[in-house]
Curated annotation (Swiss-Prot):
InterPro entries: Ribosomal_uL14 (IPR000218), Ribosomal_uL14_bac-type (IPR005745), Ribosomal_uL14_CS (IPR019972), Ribosomal_uL14_sf (IPR036853). It comes from Kocuria rhizophila (strain ATCC 9341 / DSM 348 / NBRC 103217 / DC2201). Pfam families: Ribosomal_L14. Gene3D superfamilies: Ribosomal protein L14. GO terms for biological process: translation. Belongs to the universal ribosomal protein uL14 family. Keywords: Ribonucleoprotein, Ribosomal protein, RNA-binding, rRNA-binding. The lineage of its organism: Bacteria, Bacillati, Actinomycetota, Actinomycetes, Micrococcales. Part of the 50S ribosomal subunit. Forms a cluster with proteins L3 and L19. In the 70S ribosome, L14 and L19 interact and together make contacts with the 16S rRNA in bridges B5 and B8. GO terms for cellular component: cytosolic large ribosomal subunit. This is Large ribosomal subunit protein uL14. It comes from the Bacteria. GO terms for molecular function: large ribosomal subunit rRNA binding; structural constituent of ribosome. Transmembrane segments: none annotated. Binds to 23S rRNA. Forms part of two intersubunit bridges in the 70S ribosome.
Length: 122
């Protein structure tokens, strides 16, 4: 469950290391984001020479959450960290590599490019 002011690790090679959530997209009163939901965030920590700089406002999709999520078959999935992938305006990932596993929910929400770049889909 990601909400305003939540900090997430960035799971791609855009140069950002950590982002802070500004807003959860998808409705005026929406409070929480889970795997596959899009957020607006600001870059809090970045490496020099990367595509994004500290202070940039970006859109990102959540790919891992610590809070468990119940799947339709009754199983639960949870990860060791909260992580996101930075997006371009057309919804494609800005980076060219994805680090770590991603949730299968991304396939249902039509983030096929992220699913194909990810080393593992759980």
């Amino acid at each position: 469950m990601i909400q305003q002011e939540s900090r997430l690790r960035v799971a791609d090679n855009t140069g950002a290391k950590e982002i802070l959530t500004i807003r959860v997209l998808g409705g005026s009163g929406r409070r929480y984001a889970g795997i596959g939901d899009v957020i607006v965030a600001t870059v809090k920590d970045a490496i020099p020479g990367g595509n994004v700089k500290k202070g940039d406002v970006v859109k990102a999709v959540v790919v891992r959450t610590k809070k468990q999520r119940r799947r339709p078959d009754g199983s639960y999935i949870r990860f060791d960290e909260n992580a996101a992938v930075i997006l371009k305006n057309d919804g494609d990932p800005r980076g060219t590599r994805i680090f770590g596993p991603v949730g299968r929910e991304l396939r249902d929400k039509k983030f096929m490019k992220i699913v194909s770049l990810a080393p593992e889909v759980l």
